[in-house]
Amino acid sequence: MSVKEAVAERFQEICAERNIKPNELANRAGVTPSSVYSMLDPRRKEVSVNLVKKLCDGLDMTLGEFFSTPKFDELEQEIQ
């Protein structure tokens, strides 16, 4: 699993737990809905740290809380 895939999956999990739709997440985070949908799109290969931070802020969680899951401990190194 790539870092981007793990990030998108983590946001999907959190939003599902909190019953938050992508448009609502965008509104809470102060970003465009297209930014959220782009981040969730499996065809997109990257996600910016700035976007992750804004989305975490919109969910009232820290980056530490977001990344503190085994999902991120098991990632393969990405060589480009």
Task: State where each predicted segment sits.
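A short, Lys/Arg-rich alpha-helix, primarily the initiator
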Residues: M1-K21
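Residues in the recognition helix of alpha-helical DNA-binding motifs
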Residues: I14, R28, M39, T69
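The alpha-helix within a helix-turn-helix
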Residues: C15, A26, C56
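Short alpha-helical DNA-recognition segment
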Residues: N19-S38
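Short, charged recognition helix plus adjacent turn
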Residues: S38, F67-Q80
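Short, basic-rich loop-to-helix N-cap that marks the start of a DNA-contacting helix
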Residues: R43-K54
